[in-house]
Amino acid sequence: MDRIAQSDLSLGFGSSHALPLPHPPRIPIADDSITLQIDSSFRPSSNPMPPVPLQLLEQRFDVTGSCSRVVEEDDEVVGDNDDDDQREEEQFILLGHPMKLKRGRGGNSYSLASSSPCKRFVVDSGIESRRAVVRAWGNQSIEEADPEIHEFMEKEKQRQFRGIELIASENFVCRAVMEALGSHLTNKYSEGMPGARYYTGNQYIDQIEILCQERALAAFGLNHEKWGVNVQPYSCTSANFAVFTGLLMPGERIMGLDSPSGGHMSHGYYTPGGKKVSGASIFFESFPYKVDPRTGYIDYDKLEEKALDYRPKILICGGSSYPRDWEFPRFRHIADKCGAVLMFDMAQISGLVAAKESPNPFDYCDIVTSTTHKSLRGPRGGIIFYKRGLKPKKQSINLNHCESNIQYDFEEKINFSVFPSLQGGPHNNHIAALAIALKQAASPEYKLYMRQVKKNAKALASALISRKCKLITGGTDNHLLLWDLTPLGLTGKVYEKVCEMCHITVNKVAIFSENGVISPGGVRIGSPAMTSRGCLEPEFETMADFLYRAAQIASAAQREHGKLQKEPLKSIYHCKEIADLRNQVEAFATQFAMPAFDM
């Protein structure tokens, strides 16, 4: 039986001079239609227009106007031809559009209730099949949904498992981090900060982000009254640029370690030809300090001299390829003398800092940024720590910095710079994964792991030095080392390609030669990834032998073929020496499990 509903929805069009009319009688309608009440001022009062139903469900009418029941596509159409249910068609123009009305013959008010016996409403039989298709599509595995991508992913997994990973900025995450990254948290959008979101439904997302902030402070032993943290940046480069954008006006000055000296391009970098490479150098004025080319160490005397002349607003310490500890007291002294904010980019060594295997930057710096992967073993992203609360009474010889009761103003500026100035919604799956990694970073097991990372790097350095290899600064204080290949007549580009043929991954770097000329003859090597796979000092001594043999192969091939370009490099892929080394590397690497996978 059809369900009958009452409706007071009507659509009337009348002139401004029309007299008010009493409310027309309500017409009972079925739940598949709406009554259209045309204002009587459109027609003579002697012949009022009856209410007209607007059908919401598509119905079929035969040529004579008789009502037919609603049917499925494969249903037989059976019509009623009762005289009392037949209708007339009437055409008229409404707002410039031709319209057609159907009403009962004789001009009587047409009630849908009277026509209900000639109609039967049927649910589309295809709706469940369509729903099933959508559900099936949403539940496919990668292998089912995209075999091509699945194939590439499997090949990459095998590459990681069968090779030796020595790129200093890469690592293996744990299974819990990987599960969070691939979780349902990626579905939620959450622009803003906890408690102040643009979208609703973020009560649990807020709890996750607040917990992540608390764990970030705890991992580095920080008091929440003196330090704040933003865990939303998509990368450390984004974090660095957010600091610059929040604290500086365009064109103001920053000063960081030169890229060939081991700095990072996000600190502001120009090519030797003067091209501005990073956003920091495009929107702000940057000036580098450098290492002493004879020793490879930062020349702090020249740094102080340059800083006092240049007067940067932000002085940056930290880099991507500096193998020694940073002298934070000296940096603090220089920053105070020139009135600069002191910022440390600990992207490379944040894990060592958390494990107290490296000097603590938080005792001296105003702002600290980092990646969240690399030595932290978290997801790929960035993080910003900033001082809060009262400034020290005497922070600088600049009188403007000696007043008491002045609060740090970093928090609001940096948070606003991250969002809405530079980013949209944070990646909630990343923040949850970071919270997991930070919990692990505060554990005793993680501290043992980072201690082993440092031991392994030193063992690798000693093994290379024993083979007469030249290391920048003569060794390492952290997880990475720089190998100067110029005595072997090699460039970093050629050497990394030969290593890749042997299933060893390292990365080329530019270095300063002893005469102060920038050379592409360096390679950076790091210990975190293979430490994560369970390798200890003896295994890193074996890896040193693999690296040295790869250098000998590359040097011999270069002597035979001349300067190795792309095509000659391809030609040596199948040579016996490389094939033998590749097989030995694979046999060695596959002894050690790949974290997060049963392989």
UniProtKB/Swiss-Prot annotation:
Pathway(s) per entry: One-carbon metabolism; tetrahydrofolate interconversion
GO biological process: glycine biosynthetic process from serine; tetrahydrofolate interconversion
EC number: 2.1.2.1
Primary location recorded for the protein, binned into one broad class: cytoplasm
Keywords carried by this UniProt record: Cytoplasm, One-carbon metabolism, Pyridoxal phosphate, Transferase
Reaction catalyzed: (6R)-5,10-methylene-5,6,7,8-tetrahydrofolate + glycine + H2O = (6S)-5,6,7,8-tetrahydrofolate + L-serine
Domain of life from the UniProt record: Eukaryota
Subcellular location: Cytoplasm
Modified residue annotations for N6-(pyridoxal phosphate)lysine: K374
Names of required cofactors: pyridoxal 5'-phosphate
GO molecular function: glycine hydroxymethyltransferase activity; pyridoxal phosphate binding
Regions that span the bilayer: none
Region Disordered: start-end pairs: 1-25
CDD domains per the UniProt record, alphabetical: SHMT
Class of the enzyme per the UniProt entry, highest EC level: transferase
Known partners and oligomeric status: Homotetramer.
Function: Catalyzes the interconversion of serine and glycine.
Similarity remark: Belongs to the SHMT family.
NCBIfam families in UniProt: PRK00011.1
Protein name: Serine hydroxymethyltransferase 6
Species assigned in the record: Arabidopsis thaliana
Gene for this chain: SHM6
